[in-house]
Amino acid sequence: METQIKVEEVWETLKQVKDPELPTVSIVEMGMVKDVRCQGQAVEVEIIPTFVGCPALDLIKKDVVQHLKALFPEEQIKVRFVLDIPWTSDRISEEGRENLKKMGIAPPPREYQAGQKWIVECPYCHSPKTVMENLFGPTACRSILYCTKCKNPFEAIKPV
């Protein structure tokens, strides 16, 4: 199989690998996949963790290997977590942002600067009239907010 075709197939397959903590969003949509390389009988995927201590990393690695082995049963699959560049919330694709909203999770603002006021739009009614209930949500990457317009609590991805 031609290497370029194989690389494209790997990227397409990785779009099926969901973030275990955000099951409507793929690791590609989250901007976690840094690179894909195919050489001979080997496929290597480099993944940027959203947070260094993320407890889902082992599951993500297992899912990547499982999906790629189904496509390339004879290939050696290698998954590496890379820390040479940090993941930022700007890496989330537009499709990923929409899928987060469908799940009731507000995506982070684009081009957020540390120290800047964090304005979060409600994923249900799209109102900016929201308040932070708890900076610490169910995972390290999420916070809990409340919409004063539609009266719904919701989670938001922290901007980094």
Question: What are the roles of these predicted feature ranges?
Answer:
Residues 1-160:
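Domain-level signature for proteins that mediate thiol-based redox and metal-cofactor handling
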